[in-house]
């Protein structure tokens, strides 16, 4: 990965009556524009995310999506849908005077990248995607319902289901929704910590749990749950695989960890079958973008796609 340079431009953009989103630019002000779309939903971006891009070559734009990271209000699910986020990306592009850009996203960021590209294909130079997640019921059930990845970490699964009454464990995502949006803040925070702790075990091969406090877990837990309960607003004619025809001309590289427990390779495989023009690169790695095999593969993907953007 590249040296992490400080932003040369940053601020907040009012995108609705409620929401302000954080944005920043780093790298070369005259370089090839790229936007980094973080995962979650609700994870927020970190300075390390700049490191996937050569700062001498790229004008690196990073945003924190509604309700998370440095954006305000924190952990707010109101006026917070996939299509709100797509509109926000366009507002940032217009504000910065960028015509077209490379779009880079992993996990939920891959979902949002695809949704944005299918809505505004004329604004996308290329796509670099990692850990494909299409926000389908089968994928959210794999993560947060019994019988999926729960079979890999049964001991941690018991901790995840512990806050839920036994008679409600057949629909865990819905049951957690009631806790994460409960009027009692202590109930919300306890549920958020359990949700985020569970996910942390799926991201790395040697997980250590979530080391931040419960409040720091609230955005990712609440917003993930909010999006999962609503199917990501990507059903029917909005489903990503039903709209591949809109983006088949866009240069695309998919980087997928073979042993990814959060976003298993099945989704990347299905996307590559529907989108044969995209290049699928399978890495002997898990989910975390910063683990060396994946990080190296992502840096290489960006370098390889660059000539097709110029």
From Swiss-Prot:
The keyword ATP-binding does not apply. Disulfide bonds: none annotated. Keywords: Aminopeptidase, Cytoplasm, Hydrolase, Protease. It holds the Pfam family Abhydrolase_1. It is found in: Cytoplasm. GO terms for cellular component: cytoplasm. It is an enzyme of class 3 (hydrolase). One of its GO terms (molecular function) is aminopeptidase activity. Residues 33-290 form the AB hydrolase-1 domain. The active site is at 107 (nucleophile), 260, 287 (proton donor). Its EC number is 3.4.11.5. Its main location: cytoplasm. The keyword Hydrolase applies. One of its GO terms (biological process) is proteolysis. It catalyses: Release of N-terminal proline from a peptide. Belongs to the peptidase S33 family. Hydrolyzes peptides having the structure Pro-Y-Z to yield free proline. Also hydrolyzes the dipeptide Pro-Gly. NCBIfam families: pro_imino_pep_1. This is Proline iminopeptidase.
